[in-house]
Amino acid sequence: MKLHFMKYRKIAYVISGALVLLSVLSLLFRGLNYGIDFSGGISMEVTPIEEGYTIDKMRNQLSEFNPELQQVDGKSILIRLGLPKDATDAQQNERVSQIKNILGENVEYSQVQIVGPKIGGELVRGGILAILFAFVMMAIYVWIRYRGGYAVGAFVSLFLDFVLMFGFFSITGLEFNQTAIAVILTGIGYSINDKVVNYDRIDENVKKYHKMPMADLIDLSVNEMLRRTMLTSVSTLLAMVGIFLFGGAMLRDFALAMGFSIVMGTFTSIYISNMILYNFNLRDTDK
């Protein structure tokens, strides 16, 4: 069965435009929910020992520090609180000691993480540089490998992938940390590979079918690669579902964001990059 993807290209334009608009607006007015490793602060994962020691009781005890408390894995509780920008190492350690004294023997500590504001700022800069470097390198790779409509289509869809991934973190409020950087770079790498495979097949068919209309040729090429695309996407998504369900609270955000990047990467590979390519009329017979 042949699917006519180009028939619905205008709908795909509207969907992608709406997603980009939502992403940009969310980034402008809501921003990103920076994690402790970027914003600086204290993160503690604890498990109550005493019967009836609830998250509400813990929140009341720690109210003077204005913490964020989150239930994870049924029993464990994640405690997060910021630190003043000028906090010294001694002050940071003192704050941890104060919290431990308040909680007393009511909890067990699974993880304690302290990130100073200075280190957090350096990590933010490092993360931004990593993303910019990856984007530039991928853009150069695309430009060297392709020319004309191919390069423009891959470049625009690649940029769209970045915008949508940042928008996803902003809209959902998922913690933006070093893991998020890894998710974005991994997802974009997956997406650009998918685009290259599809473009290679289109390029082969352009040389093979000299008189076939461009829309039909793109549909043919996508259908020829669809089984490979779907097998790769579905198998990776199933792995993410497994991580989401059984990997614990610390991996759920990773699985959710990675799953979104796979879906969006597949969408932009099939529609956005190919729609832009279609508008370039690669052959004289298509004019």
Regions found by a protein language model. Give the residues of each.
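A structural signal for conserved, well-ordered secondary-structure elements
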Residues: 1-287
